[in-house]
Regions:
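Residue-level detector of family-conserved "landmark" positions at structurally sensitive sites
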Residues: 52-53, 185
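Short, structured motif recognition centered on aromatic/hydrophobic residues
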Residues: 19-27, 55-56, 150-160, 188
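Short conserved catalytic/interaction loops centered on acidic-Pro-aromatic/His motifs
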Residues: 39, 165-173, 186
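Short, glycine/charged-rich beta-strand-loop motifs at protein surfaces that mediate ligand recognition
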Residues: 144, 157-162, 175
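All-alpha amphipathic helical-bundle segments outside canonical DNA-binding/catalytic cores
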Residues: 149-150, 183
């Protein structure tokens, strides 16, 4: 799932579980449902099901809510796992916690570019900056269950498949900042 710019990076094999998650993330972002279902079926016995669910949940940031709903519906069928009874992480009881976690996670991903990112996004619209930090990085990308390195590699796959070049560029750097090697990124 590489584009021209990423293909120049020397790739290295990534472990099987991570490879499945990355492929699922990319598929949700831009492939037909049948292909998403096939990739899920290949992964069902090889990947922690909670990790798959976390990658599906985060896909709503990069693929939209309809694709996320459809992907989770497919995962329920393929995995034969029921939804959890509750998800305390999803409750809006501690909005300040989401904001704090979001700022911390976003700063890891963007590194030295963090302050400039915040200014640029706020310059587009203050609501987008708030949503990026609270919703994107705090509520979603800071959830437990999957480490930030894995999440960022999955974001790279989603951005590559969906042709989101600006976000792809940023998240290639973000994957490095979150601990991925250039070879792992090339393997995506």
């Amino acid at each position: 799932m590489t584009t021209g710019a990423e293909a120049r990076v020397n790739s290295a094999p990534i472990e099987a579980g991570l490879r499945h998650l990355v492929r699922i993330a990319g598929a949700i972002a831009g492939l037909p449902e049948g292909q998403v279902r096939s990739l899920m079926a290949e992964a069902v016995d090889e990947v922690d099901p909670v990790s798959v669910e976390e990658i599906i949940l985060q896909s709503y940031l990069f693929a939209g809510f309809p694709r996320t709903l459809n992907a989770m519906r497919m995962w329920r069928v393929v995995s034969e796992r029921p939804a959890p009874d509750s998800d305390p992480e999803a409750a809006a009881e501690d909005f300040d916690l989401w904001r704090r976690r979001g700022a911390e996670t976003c700063e890891i991903v963007y590194g030295d570019s963090y302050e400039r990112l915040r200014r640029n996004v706020c310059g587009l619209h203050p609501a987008l900056d708030e949503w990026m930090i609270v919703e994107g990085y705090g509520k979603i990308l800071s959830r437990p269950g999957v480490d930030l390195r894995t999440r960022e590699l999955c974001v790279v796959a989603a951005c590559a498949v969906s042709g989101q070049q600006r976000q792809l560029h940023s998240h290639l750097h973000g994957a490095l900042n979150a601990g991925s090697s250039p070879g792992e990124i090339g393997g995506v």
